[in-house]
Amino acid sequence: MKLVILDRDGTINQDSDQYIKSPAEWKPIPGSLEAIARLTQGGWRCVVATNQSGIARGLFDMATLNAIHAEMHRRVAQVGGRIDAIFFCPHAADSNCECRKPKPGLLREIASRLDVELAGVPMIGDALRDVEAAAAVGAKPYLVLTGKGRKTREAGGLPPGTEVVADLAAIAARLAP
């Protein structure tokens, strides 16, 4: 199985310091939906791994998160793509859970549920925590320059082997030529 793991906010959709709290606030980054479609049509299974601490903060509930994800699924399907699964951490940053990126628990859950090894699996995100989580499980870290990506690159400290790409469309073109 060809698997690619995608961060959500800042990678697929526009990020917000106020959090994405409703389907109406979920706005795709230009080209990202088509990139997912390209990956899907190229035989890749696309899985999302996202921190969603807005739940723990009381900014939105599970029903709202499900509605946001339903909108994402709908919009991706409209252009011929598919997101095979969404894995998320609902905990606050100070919760000490094992699933909040940069800890590797969320990615290990993906490996367990899908019965796959993550060595070399592309993990694409816009934040240091995304590429650190990828490196922790032996996945291939890619940093996109959308969302927080430019600031992340400028801050330095990327794990060895991290590749920097303009956006999700650029890496999709490479993985599914």
PLM-predicted stretches and their roles:
Residues 12-30, 55-64, 78-82, 91-98:
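Metal-dependent phosphoesterase signature
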Residues 1-47:
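Active-site neighborhood of HAD-like aspartate-dependent phosphohydrolases
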Residues 72-77, 111:
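Conserved hydrophobic residues forming the short capping helix/wall of the S-adenosyl-L-methionine
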Residues 163-170:
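Short acidic-hydrophobic, aromatic-tinged amphipathic segments that line or gate anion-handling sites
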Residues 98-131:
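Conserved Lys-Pro-Asp/Glu-containing loop-to-beta segment of HAD-superfamily phosphomonoesterases
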Residues 32, 36-69, 85-95, 134:
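Substrate-recognition element of Asp-dependent hydrolases with the DxDx(T/V) motif
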Residues 123-163:
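Acidic, Mg2+-coordinating phosphoryl-transfer loop and its flanking beta/alpha structural elements
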